[in-house]
A protein has these predicted regions:
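Secreted/periplasmic serine-hydrolase-like ester/acetyl group-modifying domain
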Residues: 1-65, 151-170
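A broadly tuned "polar low-complexity/structure-edge" signature
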Residues: 4-25, 70, 86-92, 97-103, ...
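Amphipathic, alpha-helical segments enriched in basic
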Residues: 33, 37, 42, 67, ...
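Second-shell loop/turn segments in exported
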Residues: 41-48, 72-78, 117-123
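Residue-level preference for nonpolar/small residues embedded in alpha-helices
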Residues: 54, 83-84
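Active-site segments of SGNH/GDSL-like serine hydrolases
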Residues: 58-82
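C-terminal regions of proteins
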Residues: 84-157, 161, 167-169
Length: 170
């Protein structure tokens, strides 16, 4: 998870397995968002050095592992705007990295900010996350080649157990 890059093991908070979900949180609540335009104009600002630095580290790691990096922004009218889109687009273009911004696609995704927002437009709730996941899954299948994982039985069992637990919770 990207947030792990910014915290040392001494300061990191370890979440219990039941809320971790490998970076996802099941958020069933809903607080509607009044502002629905994710692409409002904003003041352009340069990409902060620390973000650029860690993106370079992530890129290097992906290359070393033979993986292709995809920068992704999920719908968030509270935290996203056209200026941020432009900055990330420029960085991705300069670095030859794919960038998928779902903010301009909220109508295609059928995001309803009255029902799909957990906290007034900052995060999606379960309903919104499922819509994004469906779209993202298709996007990845169409554009990237995935081979069967070579993980051991313990890893596969862990994912199967996680899926079972997730399905029970939702």
């Amino acid at each position: 998870r990207w947030k792990d890059l910014f915290f040392s093991p001494k300061t990191a908070v370890i979440l219990p397995d039941e809320v971790s979900w490998r970076g996802f949180e099941i958020r069933k609540g809903c607080r509607p968002c009044e502002r629905t335009d994710c692409m409002e104009a904003g003041e352009p600002q340069p990409l902060v050095f620390s973000i650029r630095h860690y993106l370079k580290k992530i890129q290097s790691f992906c290359r070393k592992e033979g993986s292709q990096l995809l920068l992704l922004s999920v719908p968030s009218p509270k935290n996203w705007n056209a200026a941020k889109h432009q900055i990330v687009s420029e960085y991705a273009r300069e670095e030859g990295i794919d960038f998928l911004d779902l903010n301009p696609l909220t109508q295609d995704l059928k995001i309803d900010w009255k029902t799909d927002s957990y906290d007034g437009g900052d995060h999606l709730n379960l309903s919104g996350a499922e819509k994004v996941t469906d779209y993202l899954g298709e996007y990845l299948k169409q554009r990237y080649h995935f081979s069967a994982p070579s993980a051991g039985a313990d890893v596969r069992d862990s994912w199967k157990a996680g899926l079972k637990e997730y399905l029970e919770q939702v």
